[in-house]
């Protein structure tokens, strides 16, 4: 296992380099990054679960403490204003002593409204990076989330440091551990809710710790792309299981999906075919390849797969041009992954913020970047029986492309999605998900 303490100093050097470049270009004294503040529930005295500013956790693994601030200018040692109130109602965060503290100067803040005493002077020369713009105004910042700075940071976030890649490998290991437990629970007869509990127990995470709401879908629920309902009662007939769930480590996410058939049948054969399709697309990944081209290649391969299984009729190109493949596979091939599950910067052509929109026929694609070394992306092709989309084909004259008898056979199983997390290297791809033993 990689030593994070060894990798972390170079990570800070790289982040400092980025800050120095963009602040010099924009004539800023530096950046003040706010971890965030709790959000109070309406007409209540309870807060929503706290989610830290991703720009904050890019520097250090403090992910659960609001009212913290980070002062960076690209030259000096980063300064952390760490919130430690006197509070007998709640658990107060311990003063950090982890590996990263040697690279960060730490000051303690005991009252959130006294932070001005610890912030730099002449805040009109500094940029505030965070969510709470009203706080930035009160404190007197000269700029708030300036577009040029945000575009620069989001563009370069795609290139992961060795420290970040190490964290993401650990996030993948946690996610795979949960997937193995969830698969066992499915074959043992567990309900969706019980499978969720098995996943959380295996990963040692609570529902507020996972990087996104787990999708635990049995049978036809797998046709709902973002299904999170969690039925407590097992279905009378157990047909299929789709799980889309990840792990978190030091603020970095994994995002993994698998689909299983309860018995050997046509649907199991479909899963195996989709698994081969997914691996073939991953083989195409290399620096210089456009992610859009991978998505389009997926539709080409899916068209042939649909024909092979007699779910459709016609020719592959016609299936694509008529939007038939999009009815079975309506979402994008995947996205960038890192501090956020859908990491920022997926549509940026350059550090100036030039936007590349997805193709008009594929509006839900989340990444249009050209691949480069040290990027991390998901590859997650799908095949679903979604009645609302198929009904559109019936209503607008495209019904003859579909073999409705075969569709009816597959409908009770819901759908298939297979998702791996892949690091693009200069000379090879590193499939973190498969390397950890989670095969299709």
From Swiss-Prot:
> What keywords tag this UniProt record?
Dipeptidase, Hydrolase, Manganese, Metal-binding, Metalloprotease, Protease
Gene name of the encoded protein: pepQ
Q: Where does Mn(2+) 1 bind?
A: 255, 335, 380, 419
The residues that the entry says bind Mn(2+) 2 are: 244, 255, 419
Membrane-spanning ranges:
none
Q: Name one GO cellular component term.
A: cytosol
What is the enzyme's main class?
A: hydrolase
**What name is this protein filed under?**
Xaa-Pro dipeptidase
Task: Name one process (GO BP) from the record.
Answer: proteolysis
Q: List the cofactors.
A: Mn(2+)
Physiological role: Splits dipeptides with a prolyl residue in the C-terminal position.
- E.C. numbers: 3.4.13.9
CDD domains (UniProt xref): Prolidase (cd01087)
**Which is a Pfam family this sequence falls into?**
PepQ_N
Among SUPFAM superfamilies, the record links this protein to: Creatinase/aminopeptidase
Q: Which InterPro entries match?
A: Creatin/AminoP/Spt16_N (IPR029149), Creatinase/aminopeptidase-like (IPR036005), PepQ_N (IPR048819), Pept_M24 (IPR000994), Peptidase_M24B_aminopep-P_CS (IPR001131), X-Pro_dipept-like (IPR052433), X_Pro_dipept (IPR022846)
Annotated catalysed reactions: Xaa-L-Pro dipeptide + H2O = an L-alpha-amino acid + L-proline
Q: Which domain of life is it from?
A: Bacteria
Q: What Gene3D superfamilies does this protein's entry cite?
A: Creatinase/methionine aminopeptidase superfamily (3.90.230.10), Creatinase/prolidase N-terminal domain (3.40.350.10)
Cofactor note (record): Binds 2 manganese ions per subunit.
